[in-house]
Amino acid sequence: MNISIITVGKLKEKYLKQGIAEYTKRLQAYAKIDIIELADEKAPEHLSEQDMKIIKDKEGERILSKINPDAHVIALAIEGKMKTSEELADTIDKLATYGKSKVCFVIGGSLGLSDAVMQRANEKLSFSRMTFPHQLMRLVLVEQVYRAFRIVRGEPYHK
């Protein structure tokens, strides 16, 4: 399976880079993983709704240009469906079973994802109703994808 993670914004914190590198290395035993980091739009502190939409649309165009047309797209969004680790594993297993070899997770920038990206998504996934820094979500997502593959293979993993 080919897993791509498209994310907006540059990862700055060393500890997050190290964690993501570790899980990416572990994932290579199960799938090809590609993390695509896109530039974010600079946004001043106080934005109008229209300015926020313009920024999300610009970031969205960059995201959409990187999505493989054959990919099953899972957008991370606060309004998405919450799943257990086992349910995420089941989703990945079913996609593989039904011939979807390309799965693309999308993490938006600080303002979220554009309407166009949300419409392109085959499903929306939420890890919580709380808001998290998009940089931290990269680490959480990579760990959960790794955990999902371990679950699918019946391999032990901490609960």
Curated annotation (Swiss-Prot):
Looking at its record, which EC class is this enzyme? transferase
Cross-referenced SUPFAM superfamilies: alpha/beta knot
Q: What is its EC number?
A: 2.1.1.177
* Positions contributing to S-adenosyl-L-methionine binding: L76, G108, F127, S128, R129, M130, T131, F132
GO molecular function terms noted in the UniProt entry: rRNA (pseudouridine-N3-)-methyltransferase activity
Listed under catalytic activity are:
pseudouridine(1915) in 23S rRNA + S-adenosyl-L-methionine = N(3)-methylpseudouridine(1915) in 23S rRNA + S-adenosyl-L-homocysteine + H(+)
Q: Does the keyword Isomerase apply?
A: no
Pfam families annotated for this entry? SPOUT_MTase
Q: Could you say which residues form the signal peptide?
A: none
Q: Does the keyword field hold rRNA processing?
A: yes
Q: Which domain of life is it from?
A: Bacteria
What PANTHER family does the database record attribute to this sequence?
METHYLTRANSFERASE, RIBOSOMAL RNA LARGE SUBUNIT METHYLTRANSFERASE H
Q: How does it assemble?
A: Homodimer.
The UniProt entry, under HAMAP family, shows: 23SrRNA_methyltr_H
What is the similarity comment for this entry? Belongs to the RNA methyltransferase RlmH family.
Name of this protein? Ribosomal RNA large subunit methyltransferase H
